[in-house]
Amino acid sequence: MKNSQDTQVINLVADIGGTNIRLAITDKDNNINEIKTYQCKDFPHLSNVIYHYLKENGLLNSQVNACLAIACPVDTDSISMTNLPWKFSQKQLKEELKLHSLTLINDYTAIAMAIPLLSDKQKVKIGHGEAENKQPIAVCGPGTGLGVANLVNINNHWYCLGGEGGHTDFAPVDELDVKIFQQLKTTKKRLSYEQLLSGYGLEQIYQALVIINNQEATNAEQSKLSAKEISTQAIAGTCPICQQALSQFCKILGSFSGNLALTTGSFGGVYIAGGIVPRFIDYLKNSEFRARFETKGRMSHLNEQIPTYIITESQPGLLGAAAYLNQVFP
């Protein structure tokens, strides 16, 4: 794209996590091009990696509109990355890189904004229910933490309502939930959903079940299984407690997702994002996830109508940042 002075105008998007930063160029149709992934640890500052990308792609003299999705609060000029030593001023970053515009959004705002663009190949439906056009959408994502966001459509534009829903109080539903809650409460003053629906949360469920079942782990390493190891052994059927832990994780995720649906009237669907659940889609399909999602007493008939999906698109952050930027600069 060119402006009136024949300067190339580009839209730059980024998805910045604690380990990697992904940068790309997008167009008005939200196509993502020139995707590059860099290790955050290889650069002393965010400006260095963005400058490197622009130089590498011959874009230093372009008019750049940038939208950066970042895993930390973005409502002040001064930004401190949660899991990185990077600190910067939004105003100074824009000036240093000579950007035409700079917009920072939360990482889950980006994921939420990607949802209306997803095709059937970029998501997997769990259970029944049909999405209603332009109705509210909810998304949650177990990963390092538990991200939550909501989308509403106003005058044919999607707007994201962020929040910290993952930190709401955990509410046990069945007897095993209660036992896990009681066991974890011996060391915690308060238990949020994030402390169960995350990588760390799955590990906590497993460790609680080892004690509840009065079983000694076969060795010290077995008692410190990672979330990935727990899910892998559960799927393989080689560890009964791992299976029990993953099954309970799926149930609790169903309860939490169902709560989101009722709270926000998410008749456009509830979407599951994050790096954990896509590892065991078939396991989730065969679990009690959907039963827990629908079982809401007198309101069960509402959740029975609401579809649930797992996002399988590999770059939802970049796609959502592109959608956000194109809505700002149509």
Swiss-Prot record:
Binding site for ATP: 14-19
Record-linked SUPFAM superfamilies: Actin-like ATPase domain (SSF53067)
Keywords: ATP-binding, Cytoplasm, Glycolysis, Kinase, Nucleotide-binding, Transferase
Residues making up the signal peptide according to the UniProt record: none
CDD domains membership: ASKHA_NBD_GLK
One of the GO BP terms on file: glycolytic process
GO cellular component terms listed in the entry, alphabetical order: cytosol
Localisation per UniProt entry: Cytoplasm
HAMAP family membership: Glucokinase (MF_00524)
Protein name, UniProt field: Glucokinase
Species per Swiss-Prot/TrEMBL record: Colwellia psychrerythraea (strain 34H / ATCC BAA-681) (Vibrio psychroerythus)
Gene of this entry: glk
